[in-house]
């Protein structure tokens, strides 16, 4: 969640949003120029969805005129040529100019909305401090998240590292569909008060839950280790070192993995940083040890890697994947390093980082987060595909979707919550599932579940209907 406390505003002509230092070019790695760390010329505004009450880091918008521009000071260790990607939103055909001290690159937007757009050619930078600018060459409605620069001398090596990092996603492509549950210490029973932490974890019936999942024919289960609060249902020491009392003695994750694996289902862990201040009651001082800062992420990365490495080593091949939410909290970050931590104990583990409505934040991941992706295929292409998204903001990743089947939200975190009926008719479910099957996209149906492990009978019946479509029985 966004640690910046600025309100949404435009910057006066020629005025910096903040006196940010020059950006240092990273050797053999990605260098990111953030739009909210640029000098802004014009009436552009920083967008914050919730008025900066959270810690999400969004983008700069209200970019409409050719006389508006972004400017960064970039320090290069030597003369070089750079490949440039833009994380940008607009309309197809709109032309953008990226200028350095020696040359300019002109690129035309390809997608309607957000995209990760590779600029043609290479941007030349001189040794020392360079002025890099971005502007539109025609009036349009545009948004900018960032520019990503890679030294062309390093690009082949980085591409090889990406190729070596990626895991085989065939099992996910062939799984057809799975279940997702945002269930944890934030939950409530159908009626009455919730249990204190970790009583709901201690009382959870793993075998009954796994039997229910098996009835649906699901190929995998996405289980939320954290979400509305940060209480982890396993004895992870790295978490206790940062936030004492936020883990527990029962290894619910390990038991779930064993029970699901025994029934032919894989386990994917959904992980959220848990910075929901109003709900969780964790002070910013308490989380300061986790180091969530937009401009110095070393402490955060160390904490993230120590936690995910311990989890990964503990469960090994039992843990098939990670679904890491709210990438807007930590992008830009050393996602290659974080990815290696996420794959600790199982090099074939699949990982995904959420980029909200924006394009992929890193190539060091395996599948598309796909939040709310129940209506489209996000560039997966025509029927008969292999599941890999061919074009657009998630290009190169395995197609994946997670969406609410019933609701009213992703999980139950308030007393007396009533589960809605499934939001789809059987005809709609049939069309949705067949579209995904024909393109090998993995569909993840999110069901609400009460504290005792019970779900809506209507939702369960709908999932059994999905089983008949996909499994034929």
Where are these regions (language model features)?
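Mature catalytic domains of secreted/periplasmic carbohydrate-active enzymes
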Residues: 2-473
């Amino acid at each position: 969640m966004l640690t910046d406390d600025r309100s949404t505003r435009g910057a006066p002509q020629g005025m910096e949003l903040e006196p940010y230092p020059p950006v240092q070019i990273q050797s053999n790695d990605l260098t990111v120029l953030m739009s909210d760390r640029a000098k802004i010329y014009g009436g552009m505004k920083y967008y914050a969805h919730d008025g900066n009450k959270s810690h999400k880091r969004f983008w700069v918008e209200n970019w409409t005129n050719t006389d508006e521009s972004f400017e960064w000071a970039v320090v290069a260790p030597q003369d070089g040529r750079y490949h440039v990607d833009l994380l940008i939103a607009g309309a197809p055909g709109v032309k953008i100019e990226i200028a350095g001290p020696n040359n300019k690159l002109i690129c035309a937007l390809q997608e309607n909305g957000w995209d990760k757009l590779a600029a043609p050619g290479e941007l030349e930078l001189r040794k020392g401090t360079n002025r890099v600018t971005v502007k539109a060459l025609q009036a349009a409605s545009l948004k900018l998240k960032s520019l990503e620069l890679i030294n062309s001398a390093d690009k082949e090596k980085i591409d090889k590292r990406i190729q070596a990092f990626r895991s085989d996603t065939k099992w996910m492509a062939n799984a057809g569909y799975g279940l997702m549950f945002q269930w944890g210490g934030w939950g409530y029973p159908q009626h009455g008060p919730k249990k204190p932490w970790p009583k709901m974890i201690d009382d959870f019936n793993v075998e009954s839950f796994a039997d229910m999942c098996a009835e649906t024919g699901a190929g995998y289960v996405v289980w939320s280790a954290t979400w509305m609060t940060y209480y982890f249902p396993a004895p992870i020491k790295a978490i206790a070192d940062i936030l004492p009392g936020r883990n527990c003695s029962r290894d619910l994750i390990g038991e779930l993995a064993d029970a699901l694996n025994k029934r032919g289902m894989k386990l994917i862990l959904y992980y959220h940083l848990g910075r929901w201040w109003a709900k969780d009651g964790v002070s910013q001082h308490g989380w300061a040890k986790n180091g969530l800062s937009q401009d110095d992420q070393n402490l955060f990365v160390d904490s993230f890697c120590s936690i995910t490495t311990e989890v990964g080593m503990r469960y090994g091949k039992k843990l098939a994947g990670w679904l890491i939410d709210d990438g807007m909290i930590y992008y830009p970050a050393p996602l290659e390093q974080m990815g290696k931590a996420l794959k600790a104990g199982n090099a074939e583990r699949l990982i995904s980082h959420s980029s909200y409505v924006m394009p992929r934040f890193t190539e060091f991941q395996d599948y598309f987060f796909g939040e709310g992706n129940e209506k489209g295929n996000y560039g997966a292409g025509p029927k008969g595909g292999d599941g890999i998204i061919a074009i657009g903001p998630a290009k190169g990743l395995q197609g994946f979707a997670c969406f609410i089947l019933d609701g009213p939200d992703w999980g139950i975190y308030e007393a007396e919550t009533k589960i809605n009926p499934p939001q789809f008719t059987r005809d709609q479910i049939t069309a949705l599932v067949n579209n995904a099957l024909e393109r090998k996209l993995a569909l993840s149906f999110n069901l609400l579940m009460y504290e005792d492990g019970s779900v809506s009978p209507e939702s369960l019946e709908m999932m059994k209907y999905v089983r008949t479509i996909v499994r034929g029985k």
